[in-house]
Amino acid sequence: MPRNHPSLALVAAVLLPFTAAGEVVCALGSASSYNAYRDERPSRDAMQLAGQVNQALTPICRPRCPEIALFRNATAPNVMLIAGDGQAKIVYAPQFFTTVFDAYGDAAIVALIAHELGHAVDETAPASWIKRSWSPELRADAWAACALAKVRPTPSGLREALAAIAKYPPAAQPGWNARLPALRVGFTECGGDGSQFDRAAAGKGN
């Protein structure tokens, strides 16, 4: 993935700059103050973590993987997905990623990016193990946990990633007890160990 291009692509493609007005598909915070004109290229660290999500999900969604641009913007509502006119972008607030990293580590940022990306993957390449009765947010949770399983964080990294997912829910998200089953399904269907997930969800793991 080129470090100097502001895009997260789940297929090998060069994206044009995102110009569509778009609709907020999911935001982990209020999007009322977002100013798209302040979008900037992502940091190298953010691109590297987005690359982990890319590597985790590409084998699953290929050949129907979505193409997503990644931007940073201080006015963004923590992190969000915007889509419209056949284009999509994930926008994150750099101060939010700094806060998450300091409190929860790299795996937490991977999980939050994967949740946003999961909305797009679910539209273009739905998996048979995803229950269509789940809400869009639960399906995105399942994809986030799938990515975590593929990234294979340490037990403590998984615990902290789940803690971050719980700490920063989308506005439309159901309660944590409703989210856990979808997260567990995504984790185990993508090769993760169910007992490890259960320990992490219970706040255990070293």
Q: Where are the regions a protein language model picked out?
A:
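Bacterial N-terminal signal peptides that target proteins for export
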Residues: 1-9
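N-terminal signal peptide c-region/cleavage motif recognized by signal peptidases
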Residues: 16-21
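C-terminal capping/extension segments of zinc metalloprotease domains
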Residues: 22-98, 128, 138, 149-206
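Extracytoplasmic/secreted proteins, especially bacterial periplasmic and envelope-associated proteins
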Residues: 48, 52, 108, 112, ...
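Short coil-to-beta-strand
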Residues: 84-92, 109-118
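Short pre-active-site segment immediately N-terminal to the catalytic Zn-binding motif
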Residues: 96-111, 130-132
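Catalytic Zn2+-binding segment of zinc metalloproteases
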Residues: 117-133, 147, 152
